[in-house]
Protein backbone atom coordinates (compact mmCIF):
# COMPACT_ATOMS: atom_id res chain seq x y z
CA UNK A 1 0.00 0.00 0.00
CA UNK A 2 1.20 3.49 -0.74
CA UNK A 3 2.56 4.75 2.57
CA UNK A 4 1.31 8.33 2.32
CA UNK A 5 -2.21 7.06 1.62
CA UNK A 6 -2.32 4.87 4.75
CA UNK A 7 -4.45 7.31 6.77
CA UNK A 8 -6.91 7.47 3.89
CA UNK A 9 -7.40 3.72 4.20
CA UNK A 10 -8.00 3.86 7.94
CA UNK A 11 -4.49 2.69 8.82
CA UNK A 12 -3.36 5.26 11.35
CA UNK A 13 -0.73 3.15 13.16
CA UNK A 14 1.98 4.46 10.88
CA UNK A 15 2.63 8.19 10.65
CA UNK A 16 3.47 9.04 7.02
CA UNK A 17 6.16 11.68 6.70
CA UNK A 18 7.31 13.96 3.89
CA UNK A 19 8.24 17.64 3.70
CA UNK A 20 7.33 20.56 1.52
CA UNK A 21 10.41 21.64 -0.45
CA UNK A 22 12.12 18.39 0.51
CA UNK A 23 13.94 18.59 -2.83
CA UNK A 24 15.72 21.91 -2.67
CA UNK A 25 18.56 24.20 -1.77
CA UNK A 26 19.35 22.69 1.63
CA UNK A 27 20.61 19.54 -0.12
CA UNK A 28 24.20 19.63 -1.44
CA UNK A 29 23.30 17.13 -4.16
CA UNK A 30 20.49 19.44 -5.30
CA UNK A 31 22.84 22.43 -5.49
CA UNK A 32 25.25 20.43 -7.62
CA UNK A 33 22.55 19.64 -10.20
CA UNK A 34 20.96 23.09 -10.00
CA UNK A 35 24.27 24.79 -10.85
CA UNK A 36 24.21 23.15 -14.28
CA UNK A 37 21.23 25.24 -15.47
CA UNK A 38 21.14 29.01 -15.14
CA UNK A 39 17.42 29.58 -15.72
CA UNK A 40 15.14 28.17 -13.01
CA UNK A 41 12.18 27.50 -15.30
CA UNK A 42 14.42 25.71 -17.78
CA UNK A 43 15.53 23.57 -14.84
CA UNK A 44 11.89 22.78 -13.98
CA UNK A 45 11.27 21.62 -17.56
CA UNK A 46 14.45 19.51 -17.81
CA UNK A 47 13.11 15.96 -17.57
CA UNK A 48 16.36 14.32 -16.53
CA UNK A 49 17.41 16.92 -13.95
CA UNK A 50 13.97 17.45 -12.42
CA UNK A 51 13.59 13.69 -12.09
CA UNK A 52 16.96 13.42 -10.39
CA UNK A 53 16.25 16.12 -7.81
CA UNK A 54 12.75 14.77 -7.12
CA UNK A 55 14.31 11.45 -6.13
CA UNK A 56 17.23 12.87 -4.11
CA UNK A 57 15.42 13.26 -0.76
CA UNK A 58 13.86 9.80 -1.16
CA UNK A 59 17.30 8.26 -1.59
CA UNK A 60 18.72 10.23 1.32
CA UNK A 61 15.88 10.05 3.86
CA UNK A 62 13.38 7.44 2.68
CA UNK A 63 10.33 9.69 2.98
CA UNK A 64 6.91 8.17 2.37
CA UNK A 65 6.21 10.48 -0.56
CA UNK A 66 8.09 12.20 -3.35
CA UNK A 67 6.71 15.51 -4.57
CA UNK A 68 7.47 16.32 -8.16
CA UNK A 69 10.07 19.05 -8.62
CA UNK A 70 8.27 21.90 -10.32
CA UNK A 71 6.84 25.33 -9.46
CA UNK A 72 3.35 26.76 -9.12
CA UNK A 73 4.19 29.35 -11.81
CA UNK A 74 4.86 26.82 -14.58
CA UNK A 75 1.13 26.91 -15.33
CA UNK A 76 0.80 30.63 -16.18
CA UNK A 77 4.18 30.42 -17.93
CA UNK A 78 2.97 27.55 -20.10
CA UNK A 79 -0.20 29.53 -20.85
CA UNK A 80 1.92 32.27 -22.40
CA UNK A 81 2.25 34.61 -19.43
CA UNK A 82 5.59 36.33 -18.96
CA UNK A 83 7.32 34.75 -15.93
CA UNK A 84 10.96 34.94 -14.94
CA UNK A 85 12.98 34.11 -11.84
CA UNK A 86 15.68 36.54 -10.77
CA UNK A 87 18.46 35.34 -8.50
CA UNK A 88 18.08 36.61 -4.92
CA UNK A 89 14.81 38.31 -5.91
CA UNK A 90 12.39 35.56 -6.88
CA UNK A 91 9.64 35.49 -9.50
CA UNK A 92 9.03 38.53 -11.70
CA UNK A 93 5.90 38.51 -13.86
CA UNK A 94 4.13 40.71 -16.35
CA UNK A 95 1.38 42.47 -14.40
CA UNK A 96 -2.22 41.71 -15.27
CA UNK A 97 -3.98 45.09 -15.35
CA UNK A 98 -6.92 45.03 -17.75
CA UNK A 99 -9.16 43.01 -20.05
CA UNK A 100 -6.60 43.63 -22.79
CA UNK A 101 -4.13 41.41 -20.98
CA UNK A 102 -6.17 38.29 -21.73
CA UNK A 103 -4.65 38.40 -25.22
CA UNK A 104 -1.35 37.25 -23.67
CA UNK A 105 -2.97 34.11 -22.25
CA UNK A 106 -3.44 31.05 -24.42
CA UNK A 107 -6.51 28.84 -24.24
CA UNK A 108 -4.31 25.76 -24.52
CA UNK A 109 -1.00 25.45 -22.66
CA UNK A 110 2.12 25.07 -24.77
CA UNK A 111 4.53 22.13 -24.86
CA UNK A 112 6.17 23.12 -21.57
CA UNK A 113 3.55 21.38 -19.43
CA UNK A 114 4.17 18.18 -21.37
CA UNK A 115 7.65 18.27 -19.87
CA UNK A 116 6.11 18.25 -16.38
CA UNK A 117 4.04 15.19 -17.27
CA UNK A 118 7.11 13.47 -18.71
CA UNK A 119 8.93 14.11 -15.43
CA UNK A 120 6.07 12.50 -13.49
CA UNK A 121 6.16 9.43 -15.74
CA UNK A 122 9.92 9.11 -15.39
CA UNK A 123 9.88 9.55 -11.60
CA UNK A 124 7.07 7.02 -11.34
CA UNK A 125 9.18 4.40 -13.10
CA UNK A 126 12.13 4.96 -10.77
CA UNK A 127 10.27 5.43 -7.48
CA UNK A 128 10.07 2.43 -5.12
CA UNK A 129 6.49 1.11 -5.19
CA UNK A 130 5.48 1.80 -1.54
CA UNK A 131 6.31 5.50 -1.94
CA UNK A 132 3.60 7.87 -3.14
CA UNK A 133 4.19 10.43 -5.86
CA UNK A 134 2.61 13.85 -5.30
CA UNK A 135 1.74 16.16 -8.16
CA UNK A 136 0.75 19.73 -7.42
CA UNK A 137 -0.39 23.14 -8.61
CA UNK A 138 -0.79 26.58 -7.18
CA UNK A 139 -4.33 27.41 -6.12
CA UNK A 140 -6.05 30.01 -8.31
CA UNK A 141 -5.92 32.87 -5.80
CA UNK A 142 -2.18 32.51 -5.22
CA UNK A 143 -1.35 32.22 -8.93
CA UNK A 144 -3.67 35.15 -9.67
CA UNK A 145 -1.96 37.20 -6.94
CA UNK A 146 1.43 36.70 -8.57
CA UNK A 147 -0.01 37.87 -11.87
CA UNK A 148 -1.67 40.93 -10.32
CA UNK A 149 1.31 41.92 -8.19
CA UNK A 150 3.98 41.17 -10.78
CA UNK A 151 6.10 39.58 -8.07
CA UNK A 152 5.82 37.60 -4.86
CA UNK A 153 5.85 38.35 -1.14
CA UNK A 154 4.17 41.74 -1.31
CA UNK A 155 1.59 43.28 1.01
CA UNK A 156 -1.05 42.34 -1.60
CA UNK A 157 -2.57 45.81 -1.74
CA UNK A 158 -2.46 45.68 -5.54
CA UNK A 159 -4.24 42.30 -5.72
CA UNK A 160 -6.90 43.18 -3.18
CA UNK A 161 -7.56 46.61 -4.69
CA UNK A 162 -7.95 44.95 -8.09
CA UNK A 163 -10.54 42.40 -6.94
CA UNK A 164 -12.51 45.07 -5.05
CA UNK A 165 -12.63 47.47 -8.01
CA UNK A 166 -12.86 44.98 -10.91
CA UNK A 167 -15.28 42.31 -9.76
CA UNK A 168 -16.29 41.02 -13.20
CA UNK A 169 -12.76 41.00 -14.61
CA UNK A 170 -11.37 39.43 -11.43
CA UNK A 171 -13.98 36.69 -11.65
CA UNK A 172 -13.12 36.08 -15.30
CA UNK A 173 -9.41 35.73 -14.52
CA UNK A 174 -10.15 33.52 -11.51
CA UNK A 175 -12.38 31.21 -13.56
CA UNK A 176 -9.76 30.94 -16.32
CA UNK A 177 -7.03 29.96 -13.85
CA UNK A 178 -9.38 27.58 -12.02
CA UNK A 179 -10.22 25.69 -15.20
CA UNK A 180 -6.58 25.42 -16.29
CA UNK A 181 -5.47 24.34 -12.81
CA UNK A 182 -7.99 21.49 -12.76
CA UNK A 183 -6.80 20.36 -16.20
CA UNK A 184 -3.17 20.50 -15.04
CA UNK A 185 -3.91 18.33 -12.01
CA UNK A 186 -5.91 15.84 -14.06
CA UNK A 187 -3.00 15.50 -16.49
CA UNK A 188 -0.62 14.93 -13.59
CA UNK A 189 -2.85 12.13 -12.29
CA UNK A 190 -3.02 10.66 -15.80
CA UNK A 191 0.77 10.70 -15.88
CA UNK A 192 1.05 8.71 -12.66
CA UNK A 193 0.70 11.04 -9.66
CA UNK A 194 -0.83 9.11 -6.74
CA UNK A 195 -1.79 12.19 -4.73
CA UNK A 196 -2.45 15.80 -5.76
CA UNK A 197 -1.85 18.97 -3.78
CA UNK A 198 -3.07 22.56 -4.08
CA UNK A 199 -0.83 25.24 -2.60
CA UNK A 200 -2.64 28.46 -1.64
CA UNK A 201 0.28 30.34 -0.12
CA UNK A 202 -1.47 33.72 0.04
CA UNK A 203 -4.97 32.70 1.14
CA UNK A 204 -4.35 34.22 4.56
CA UNK A 205 -4.43 37.80 3.25
CA UNK A 206 -8.15 37.70 2.45
CA UNK A 207 -11.15 38.64 4.58
CA UNK A 208 -13.96 36.10 4.92
CA UNK A 209 -16.08 37.22 1.96
CA UNK A 210 -13.12 37.24 -0.44
CA UNK A 211 -11.73 34.03 1.10
CA UNK A 212 -15.01 32.34 0.21
CA UNK A 213 -15.03 33.71 -3.34
CA UNK A 214 -11.34 33.37 -4.23
CA UNK A 215 -10.21 30.39 -2.13
CA UNK A 216 -13.13 28.15 -1.16
CA UNK A 217 -15.20 28.30 -4.36
CA UNK A 218 -12.39 27.73 -6.89
CA UNK A 219 -10.89 24.96 -4.75
CA UNK A 220 -14.27 23.21 -4.68
CA UNK A 221 -14.59 23.52 -8.47
CA UNK A 222 -11.12 22.08 -9.03
CA UNK A 223 -11.63 19.15 -6.68
CA UNK A 224 -15.03 18.26 -8.14
CA UNK A 225 -13.64 18.38 -11.69
CA UNK A 226 -10.62 16.23 -10.79
CA UNK A 227 -12.76 13.74 -8.87
CA UNK A 228 -15.01 13.25 -11.91
CA UNK A 229 -12.02 11.70 -13.65
CA UNK A 230 -10.03 10.37 -10.68
CA UNK A 231 -12.50 9.76 -7.83
CA UNK A 232 -10.00 7.76 -5.78
CA UNK A 233 -7.02 10.12 -6.09
CA UNK A 234 -6.48 11.87 -2.73
CA UNK A 235 -6.25 15.66 -2.82
CA UNK A 236 -4.39 17.76 -0.26
CA UNK A 237 -5.30 21.43 0.08
CA UNK A 238 -3.12 23.98 1.86
CA UNK A 239 -4.86 27.33 2.44
CA UNK A 240 -1.85 28.69 4.30
CA UNK A 241 -2.51 31.31 6.94
CA UNK A 242 -6.29 30.82 6.87
CA UNK A 243 -6.54 31.07 10.66
CA UNK A 244 -10.16 30.82 11.85
CA UNK A 245 -11.23 30.32 8.24
CA UNK A 246 -9.65 26.85 8.18
CA UNK A 247 -12.86 25.61 9.82
CA UNK A 248 -15.05 27.17 7.13
CA UNK A 249 -12.73 25.62 4.53
CA UNK A 250 -13.11 22.14 6.05
CA UNK A 251 -16.91 22.44 6.14
CA UNK A 252 -17.30 23.63 2.57
CA UNK A 253 -14.49 22.02 0.54
CA UNK A 254 -14.57 18.24 -0.17
CA UNK A 255 -10.88 17.64 0.52
CA UNK A 256 -9.19 14.41 1.58
CA UNK A 257 -6.30 16.06 3.42
CA UNK A 258 -5.98 19.51 5.01
CA UNK A 259 -2.42 20.83 5.29
CA UNK A 260 -2.02 23.43 8.03
CA UNK A 261 0.62 25.97 8.97
CA UNK A 262 2.49 26.16 12.28
CA UNK A 263 0.13 28.78 13.73
CA UNK A 264 -2.69 26.26 14.05
CA UNK A 265 -3.05 24.96 17.65
CA UNK A 266 -2.45 21.24 18.05
CA UNK A 267 -5.81 20.73 19.75
CA UNK A 268 -7.50 22.18 16.66
CA UNK A 269 -5.56 19.77 14.46
CA UNK A 270 -6.72 16.92 16.67
CA UNK A 271 -10.33 18.09 16.50
CA UNK A 272 -10.25 18.50 12.72
CA UNK A 273 -8.68 15.07 12.22
CA UNK A 274 -12.07 13.52 13.06
CA UNK A 275 -13.42 15.10 9.86
CA UNK A 276 -10.43 15.08 7.52
CA UNK A 277 -6.84 13.88 7.44
CA UNK A 278 -4.61 16.64 8.79
CA UNK A 279 -1.06 17.32 7.57
CA UNK A 280 1.45 19.49 9.40
CA UNK A 281 2.67 21.43 11.18
CA UNK A 282 6.18 21.69 12.66
CA UNK A 283 7.62 25.20 12.34
CA UNK A 284 10.38 25.00 9.66
CA UNK A 285 12.57 27.21 11.88
CA UNK A 286 12.71 24.39 14.45
CA UNK A 287 14.92 22.53 11.96
CA UNK A 288 17.48 25.34 12.26
CA UNK A 289 17.95 24.65 15.98
CA UNK A 290 19.31 21.55 17.74
CA UNK A 291 18.26 17.96 18.31
CA UNK A 292 16.79 18.55 21.76
CA UNK A 293 14.46 21.28 20.52
CA UNK A 294 13.54 19.26 17.43
CA UNK A 295 12.75 16.27 19.63
CA UNK A 296 10.69 18.33 22.08
CA UNK A 297 8.57 20.07 19.42
CA UNK A 298 8.10 16.91 17.36
CA UNK A 299 7.10 14.85 20.39
CA UNK A 300 4.35 17.33 21.26
CA UNK A 301 2.85 17.04 17.79
CA UNK A 302 3.09 13.25 17.71
CA UNK A 303 1.55 12.88 21.16
CA UNK A 304 -1.44 15.08 20.40
CA UNK A 305 -2.00 13.44 17.00
CA UNK A 306 -1.38 9.89 18.23
CA UNK A 307 -3.86 7.49 16.63
CA UNK A 308 -5.45 10.27 14.58
CA UNK A 309 -5.74 10.72 10.81
CA UNK A 310 -2.43 12.49 10.41
CA UNK A 311 0.50 13.04 8.05
CA UNK A 312 3.65 14.56 9.57
CA UNK A 313 5.00 17.56 7.70
CA UNK A 314 6.13 21.12 8.31
CA UNK A 315 3.99 24.24 8.51
CA UNK A 316 5.66 25.43 5.31
CA UNK A 317 8.68 24.47 3.17
CA UNK A 318 12.12 23.44 4.39
CA UNK A 319 14.32 26.53 4.63
CA UNK A 320 17.43 26.68 2.41
CA UNK A 321 19.78 27.00 5.41
CA UNK A 322 18.43 23.85 7.11
CA UNK A 323 21.18 21.39 8.16
CA UNK A 324 20.68 18.04 6.43
CA UNK A 325 21.54 16.20 9.66
CA UNK A 326 18.57 17.85 11.38
CA UNK A 327 16.19 16.59 8.70
CA UNK A 328 17.68 13.13 9.13
CA UNK A 329 17.31 13.30 12.91
CA UNK A 330 13.68 14.42 12.68
CA UNK A 331 12.80 11.67 10.21
CA UNK A 332 14.47 8.99 12.33
CA UNK A 333 12.77 10.32 15.46
CA UNK A 334 9.32 10.03 13.88
CA UNK A 335 10.13 6.46 12.79
CA UNK A 336 11.37 5.59 16.27
CA UNK A 337 8.22 7.05 17.81
CA UNK A 338 6.12 4.80 15.58
CA UNK A 339 8.06 1.70 16.58
CA UNK A 340 8.12 2.33 20.31
CA UNK A 341 4.81 4.00 20.89
CA UNK A 342 2.26 1.48 19.65
CA UNK A 343 1.29 0.32 23.13
CA UNK A 344 3.79 1.99 25.44
CA UNK A 345 5.10 5.34 26.57
CA UNK A 346 8.00 6.95 24.75
UniProtKB/Swiss-Prot annotation:
Pathway annotation from the record: Porphyrin-containing compound metabolism; protoporphyrin-IX biosynthesis; coproporphyrinogen-III from 5-aminolevulinate: step 4/4
Organism this protein belongs to: Rickettsia conorii (strain ATCC VR-613 / Malish 7)
Binding, substrate: 21-25, 40, 71, 146, 201, 316
Pfam families reported for this sequence: URO-D
Principal place of residence: cytoplasm
GO MF terms held by the record: uroporphyrinogen decarboxylase activity
Site (Transition state stabilizer): 71
Gene giving rise to this polypeptide: hemE
Role description: Catalyzes the decarboxylation of four acetate groups of uroporphyrinogen-III to yield coproporphyrinogen-III.
HAMAP family for the chain: URO_D
This protein's name: Uroporphyrinogen decarboxylase
Lineage: Bacteria, Pseudomonadati, Pseudomonadota, Alphaproteobacteria, Rickettsiales
Amino acid sequence: MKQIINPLKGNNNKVPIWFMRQAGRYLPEYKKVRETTKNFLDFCYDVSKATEVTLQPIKRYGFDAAIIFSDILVLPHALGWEVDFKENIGPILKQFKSQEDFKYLQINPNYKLEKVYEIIKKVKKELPSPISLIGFAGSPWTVMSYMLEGKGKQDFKTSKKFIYENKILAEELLNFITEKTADHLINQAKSGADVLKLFDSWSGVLAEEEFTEFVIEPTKKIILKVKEVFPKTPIIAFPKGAGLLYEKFIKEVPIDVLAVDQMVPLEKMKEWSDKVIVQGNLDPVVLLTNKEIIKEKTYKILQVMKGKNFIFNLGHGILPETPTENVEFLTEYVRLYEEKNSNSTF
